[in-house]
Curated annotation (Swiss-Prot):
The gene is radA. Its EC number is 3.6.4.-. A motif (RadA KNRFG motif) lies at residues 252-256. Keywords: ATP-binding, DNA damage, DNA repair, DNA-binding, Hydrolase, Metal-binding, Nucleotide-binding, Stress response, Zinc, Zinc-finger. The keyword Cytoplasm does not apply. Residues 351-453 are annotated as: Lon-protease-like. It comes from Pseudomonas aeruginosa (strain ATCC 15692 / DSM 22644 / CIP 104116 / JCM 14847 / LMG 12228 / 1C / PRS 101 / PAO1). A zinc finger (C4-type) spans 10-27. This is DNA repair protein RadA.
Amino acid sequence: MAKAKRMYGCTECGATFPKWAGQCADCGAWNTLVETVVEAAPSGSGRGGWAGQQANLKTLAEVSVEEMPRFTTGSTELDRVLGGGLVDGSVVLIGGDPGIGKSTILLQTLCNLASRVPALYVTGEESQQQVAMRARRLSLPEDKLKVMTETSIETIIATARQEQPRVMVIDSIQTIFTEQLQSAPGGVAQVRESAAMLVRYAKQSGTAIFLVGHVTKEGALAGPRVLEHMVDTVLYFEGESDGRLRLLRAVKNRFGAVNELGVFGMTDKGLKEVSNPSAIFLTRAQEAVPGSVVMATWEGSRPMLVEVQALVDTSHLANPRRVTLGLDQNRLAMLLAVLHRHGGIPTYDQDVFLNVVGGVKVLETASDLALMAAVMSSLRNRPLPHDLLVFGEVGLSGEVRPVPSGQERLKEAGKHGFKRAIVPLGNAPKEAPAGLQVIAVTRLEQALDALFE
């Protein structure tokens, strides 16, 4: 038997080194090297590529290109995040905080899929009785889905080859181990090798696999960063565990758009998809309040209306506070400087708090104009109309720049009964949606004047 060799692997990029160091020489990350045991694989161990032991060489012209077949999961929101459905042979990694609903949504999906295609649910964290209890509590169909409690990757793959499921769930990848390594499950080497064997099996058999991944206290997926590079799709489940809304976001997708967002609501019968998220994120209070404005953000392939709230108050600190929830804090500091320079509105003695209602994260620059409108409304203590929509990027010289998909954003506003919209001139349509007055601006000063007409 080959002698085991101790190496140090980086949890971020997967690089290995013979000695420990404070910084990874490959990716530059600090304090990411952990000790692993590397064993020489015996000859003929079957560690070949997806095409087998012999290389398969073709020119691009010789490769037949066909549209990747997809099949629906039964959930419109999940299909949207996946890019239109599940692709045969794809590997999807889904991560999120404990209790956010990762196992729930996958159990619901597989129970519904099992009535149409063979499905296998593999759990290393729960017993079969616990999975059955959860399915009955959610009133899910139980007669078709096969459940297996196992943590050995060799046993899991052998069972999958025998059952030949079209869809399989591994809950979770951190509990799975390979007998070829002596390290404990959840280690860098175990997670990497187990995931590699699952990816290889998925590509060879055409089975679509969902992997559940744990997250660290910083919110990143636990284990080696190479895990995210190996899979086809990476999804993150976001939201407060004690809240009602759950947001499923695609941060990597080889078969669809990234940053695609699916919205779900947690009920006593599990996760229910929200087909009209704009209606959920708009509070529509009885009376207009200062500091509140609605913007149209773009998530993946669809527009979504969200409410931005600002609170500006006199600061008693030497350095006024700048707090954001769902928005970029550095961009807020920049926009406040632009507001002072080109709008003549100083905030150096004011605390500024910003929040996006519903826990949505808005990272695109189309939120600039709405952010500044909310700050102005709170600072002057003057409410903005309920039926006003604002979006646009603001540059350092005070110009208002157009943003992508402006027409679709305006159509979404028109569907929800908005009457006025302040937008960049480049996004002004030739013919506005019925009932919507579009005010096109090119400068920040024009936008501020239009806000309080």
